[in-house]
Structure formats: structure tokens, C-alpha cells
A protein has these predicted regions:
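N-terminal alpha-helical transmembrane segments of multi-pass membrane transport
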Residues: 1-132, 271, 275
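Membrane-water interface regions at transmembrane-helix termini and the short interhelical loops
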Residues: 2-8, 34-48, 68-88, 136-143, ...
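Helix-loop-helix module between adjacent transmembrane segments
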Residues: 7-10, 14-17, 21-31, 64-67, ...
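Membrane-water interface at loop-to-transmembrane-helix junctions
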Residues: 190-194, 309-322, 339-348, 353
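Selective recognition of specific alpha-helical transmembrane segments in multi-pass small-molecule
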Residues: 21, 97-106, 196-205, 233-248, ...
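Extracellular/periplasmic helix-exit of transmembrane alpha-helices
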Residues: 110-124, 273-297, 356-388
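Helix-loop-helix junctions that connect adjacent transmembrane segments
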Residues: 217, 223-235, 272-321
Length: 393
């Protein structure tokens, strides 16, 4: 192990070297053979959708049920840390960091686009169906709501428990301690951490790509900056630099403050759109759509369109389930790190309910406003969004 503790870093070569070798090899192959790589990834995705959709559905259902059961069982009273410990962060700071960790760029990118696409291009059939508004927003909330956060919650809970109650490292390998025992400190543990790093990198790449596309399109629209590979590279470098500075400043001085600023800005933007838009319609739609979402949660979560000839599932639900699962090691470690001192019940309710309620508000305010524009005759706006999601800036 390479010890750079004087600079705040400890590098485990058994994890770092295989991870960087695999990732660089993958990037190299994609750069050298972009068409073949794209075709291979497309074939793999199609095979997963055709043969493993049921597995994704079962896993997501089990995680959701397990989260609810644990939250309201006797183990909910266990504290993640010493029995007399208190939370490291205030409720607002904690929730702000949850929001920033799990849904930041994604909400900005999909808040308008996804409900519009589901409305104009529903899973089955063509055009905007009667009652399609409920279905469009409901599907969006399904992808960003309780199911997604149950993945993060359980991963973070396991890591927090073994780290703060058993004194194990705050890494994915610790989740396998009940199975592997002390072997987590050997090759098996290193392999698990390599897997976590690879999954995290793919998840971050997806989010970063969405943000870069959105910023690039926004700069082109507002200031006439030509969209190009150089522009996207510059945006990517800028985002990575800001992230690096935030991490270098530490959790309290960097990530915490940045998360709080993000939360204030997001809430301000949400309130602004709510007040200048069709406020009564948005609030009524929010209540109606949330009721529809909760009432149909089991049905929509397990609907794989098995008997329908549609490619919608692979492009949306299965894509999201895979995205959340790939993000889980990274987001889980971060959520565990900021949740020391909270009870399991408080932790699970906070991680699952608070972000989901914010998602419900966000998707209904922005998605509802966009669908109302389409009703008002702005069909070209809807078609533009459906054809190019990055137009939403």
C-alpha cells in the first residue's frame, strides 16, 4: 500500500492498479473502435432487456420491500455509531448532501424532458393518449422515486452499520464481511473494491455526460457558442476541476457547503417556476399524480411490457435500474459517511422519503408546466424535446 497520508491519501495498489488498467483499456477500445464499441454495447443492452428484465424487476422490488420492513422493525432503533452518539450533521445539511449525491444533474436534465417524452411517446401506442399526463409523470416518478432511493439506502445502511458499529473500513468489501469474514482484507476484498470502482466510473460517466450535453446546448442557445468536441471537453474539465476542489477542501468546507448552495438554488428555481406558471394546475396535478404513483407503485414497478412489442423498457426503466445500481457503491459510501449517529429508522426514512418527495415536487412542477405548454399549442416545443433531450437547459 502506498501511503501518502501526509497529503490525506492512502492508495491501495491492489485496488488502484487493476481498476485504472481496466478503465484505461476500456476507454482506449472505445476511442479506437467507436462504431464497433457502440454496436457491442447496444447488443449487450438488448440482450439484457430481453433476457434479464425480470431479474432487475425482482431485485428492485426486494430492495424496496426490505427497506420498508427494516425501517419499521425493531432494528430501526439501532444507532449507526455508538449508542450515545448524535448525528454529525444538521438535518438540512444532511438532506442537502443526499440531494446532491443522488439526483443533482439528473433532475436538471430530465425534469422537463422525461415527462414530455413519456407523454408524447408513451410505452405503448402513439401520440398523447387521453389521461396520458398521469402516466407520463407517474413513470418519471417511478424512475426517480422510492425504488431508486431504496438501492442507495440499503447499500449505505450496510456500509454504515459495519463501519460505525463493527469498525470495518468504509468500502464495499465490508458489506461482504458476513460471507467472507477476514478474507475481505485479501484478494477477494480487493476484487470487490475494483468492481465498485468500475461500476462507479460508469455511473459517473453517465451523469457527467448528461450535464455536459445540457450545458453545451444551453451555451449554444444563449450565447451562440458552437457545439463541438472542444467545448464539451472544456466543460468536462471545468466540472472535474470544481469537483476536485470541493473534495480537496474536505467534507465540511467543500462538499457540505456546495450541497447547501445547490439546495438553496434548486428550491429557489422550483418556487420561481411554480409561482410564474399555472400554480393551481401544478399543485392539483402534484396531488393527483402522487396519489396515482403511490396507488400504482406495485403495478408500475413490476410491469415489464412482456406481451407488448415495445423498445421503451430498455431505453428507460431498465436503463435507470442499471444506472442506480451502478451508482450504489459510490453514493452508498458517501451517504454512509454523512449519516453517522442516526438511527436506522431515521436513516431509512430520511434517505427514501425526503428525496422522493422533492423529486415528486420537481417532476410535477417542471414536467407539469411543460405538458401544460403542449396543451396550450406549443407542440413544436414538445417534439423538439422528444427529439433532443439536451435542448432542456
Amino acid at each position: 500500500m502506498l501511503n501518502l497520508s501526509d497529503r490525506g491519501f492512502v492508495v491501495d495498489r491492489a485496488v488502484f492498479i487493476p481498476s485504472i488498467a481496466f478503465l484505461l483499456s476500456t476507454v482506449g477500445i472505445v476511442l479506437l473502435c467507436p462504431n464497433a464499441s457502440g454496436s457491442a454495447f447496444g447488443t449487450l443492452q438488448a440482450a439484457i432487456v430481453e433476457n434479464a428484465s425480470w431479474f432487475y424487476g425482482i431485485v428492485m422490488a426486494i430492495l424496496l420491500v426490505a427497506s420498508v420492513v427494516l425501517a419499521f422493525s425493531r432494528v430501526g432503533n439501532i444507532r449507526l455509531g455508538p449508542d450515545n452518539s448524535s448525528p454529525d450533521y444538521s438535518l438540512f445539511s444532511w438532506l442537502s448532501m443526499l440531494f446532491a449525491a443522488g439526483v443533482g444533474i439528473g433532475l436538471m436534465f430530465y425534469g422537463v424532458a422525461e415527462p414530455v417524452v413519456h407523454y408524447l411517446r408513451p410505452p405503448v401506442g402513439e401520440g398523447a393518449p387521453v389521461g396520458g399526463e398521469n402516466q407520463a409523470v407517474n413513470l418519471t416518478m417511478l424512475h426517480w422515486g422510492f425504488n431508486a432511493w431504496s438501492v442507495y439506502a440499503l447499500m449505505a445502511l450496510v456500509l454504515a452499520y459495519f463501519s460505525f458499529r463493527r469498525g470495518l473500513p468504509l468500502t464495499l468489501r465490508s458489506a461482504f464481511y458476513p460471507i467472507l469474514g477476514d478474507r475481505i482484507y485479501g484478494p477477494w476484498g480487493a476484487a470487490i473494491d475494483v468492481f465498485a470502482i468500475v461500476c462507479t466510473t460508469f455511473g459517473i460517466s453517465t451523469s457527467l455526460g448528461l450535464g455536459v450535453e445540457q450545458l453545451s446546448t444551453g451555451l449554444n442557445y444563449l450565447f451562440g457558442v458552437p457545439e463541438s468536441g472542444a467545448l464539451k471537453l472544456a466543460i468536462t474539465v471545468a466540472i472535474m476541476a470544481m469537483a476536485a476542489v470541493s473534495v480537496a477542501l474536505g467534507l465540511d468546507s467543500g462538499i457540505k457547503r456546495l450541497s447547501e448552495i445547490n439546495s438553496f438554488l434548486a428550491i429557489a428555481l422550483l418556487c420561481f417556476v411554480l409561482l410564474i406558471g399555472p400554480t393551481a394546475l401544478i399543485l392539483g396535478g402534484t396531488l393527483e399524480n402522487f396519489g396515482y404513483y403511490v396507488a400504482n407503485l406495485i403495478t408500475t414497478s413490476t410491469n415489464l411490457f412482456t406481451y407488448e412489442d415495445t423498445e421503451w423498457l430498455g431505453g428507460w426503466t431498465i436503463f435507470y435500474w442499471g444506472w442506480w445500481i451502478s451508482w450504489a457503491p459510490f453514493v452508498g459510501i458517501f451517504i454512509a459517511r454523512i449519516s453517522r449517529g442516526r438511527t436506522i429508522r431515521e436513516f431509512l426514512i430520511g434517505v427514501m422519503v425526503a428525496p422522493t418527495l422533492f423529486v415528486v415536487l420537481w417532476m410535477n412542477v417542471f414536467g407539469g408546466s411543460a405538458i401544460d405548454l403542449i396543451h396550450a399549442g406549443e407542440v413544436s416545443f414538445g417534439e423538439a424535446v422528444a427529439n433532443d433531450l439536451s435542448l432542456i437547459h
